[in-house]
């Protein structure tokens, strides 16, 4: 596990962003192996979010029998008035398996409405089954026929940053 506080990546560097006709979707992994590579401020923000919502995450995971769920922050942004969204249809593919959302911890009131005004955003922490290869480059995110394979580029950036984080931490330990 990389040490926290030595990363330089921004949230946009690890977020997957794609559009359907009505929506812009942003998917951000909350796995510690990934967020520890963020800049200290961004890491603090993401780890703080997980900490603040820990009880709700744990309760949702327990309700669905998931001892160690994979967490993502997911945002749906309305590109037109009354844009419908169905978060249950946001699937992730990894190592030949498809993962559907198991549970949701809403972060905005719009999440439960399943419809967005133009320029409105619905955000939640989405729980998936464990078993995704987040450090591999084969993660595919799909929603209603649209998908992105941009994770391949993110995975390369994560690998470079992981090496740099360990080097920076080692150098800091020698001072």
Report the location of each language-model feature:
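Conserved functional micro-motifs across diverse proteins
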Residues: 1-175
